[in-house]
Amino acid sequence: MGVGWYRYPGGKGRVDDPLIEDLIREEAYFAKVTRTEISEAEIQEHLLLAMINEAADILGEGIAHSAAEIDLVSVLGYGFPRWRGGLMHYADELGVPNIVNQISKLAETDPVAWKLSDVLKHCERTGTKLSEYHLNRIDS
């Protein structure tokens, strides 16, 4: 029998498996990772920033030809809120400089996971909205 995140003692409902909790604490200790609480709002912000950063790379690689294509997929395929207009429209509302600033701060703690998209750098430098970005404009 394998070990999972939870145990179901006596078939009564799940409880956190203390062995897994101990394993997590031990691995964090050896990796010198300080465990911290992260709010739901912070998790949501990090996920959106990661999605925006990756979507910008998708534009830069020519996989998508426009921010509108990404908006369409984000709303119809991923369930992104329609009233936000799609992921890239929402990113334009947040503002590219704001997004670049937030990702740059996160990159200070993990530069591999938070490598800033060249498209975002370009848009910030030129004052271009993501919705106005075209692949042949990049000059980084």
Regions found by a protein language model. Give the residues of each.
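N-terminal glycine-rich phosphate-binding loop for ADP-containing cofactors
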Residues: 1-140
